[in-house]
């Protein structure tokens, strides 16, 4: 109750955002962090009385495939196969059909607590890259301009823990277990296999380094197998 009454946010950070206090505790993507750094488009909340900062860097990006409950007044949208609640009327207006948005629009959602969309990026800045492992791929018949066609959808579990579904060329093959890059640009979405690179070593006791390589404060680690089984470690 004390937390809820003192919590302020969500806010979307700009390049010049300065907090009104120095936080004693910081949580980044719900995990304890030693850095209070805010980068452009980070979603953040704070409690000045508790001297605590919460930062979220998770994003969802892709083409909108569904809006609900209506195109003119959306409360949620589906992007890359997952439905997200829109956190404010200002965000909803950006994807409303009344303003030229909606199904088919390429967006990047800035996700805050409980993966609610706290901000949205459209246009040229809606450019994101995710990495993950192919979970499955499926081809289905669709009706395209009054003729039958095949739509292939690839499901990828990414390093941020989110599963993304991307439509790709029907002639391409993406076997389960492949490591891939999912790229989202204003022109649409693409999936490409990535070349394997490796590092080795022992994780230190504070989980801040692998061998002699320091780990970023917000590093994302995905444990995978050749059979496509995967889960986030951090």
Regions found by a protein language model. Name each.
Residues 1-234:
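...the same signal can extend to comparable exposed beta-sheet modules
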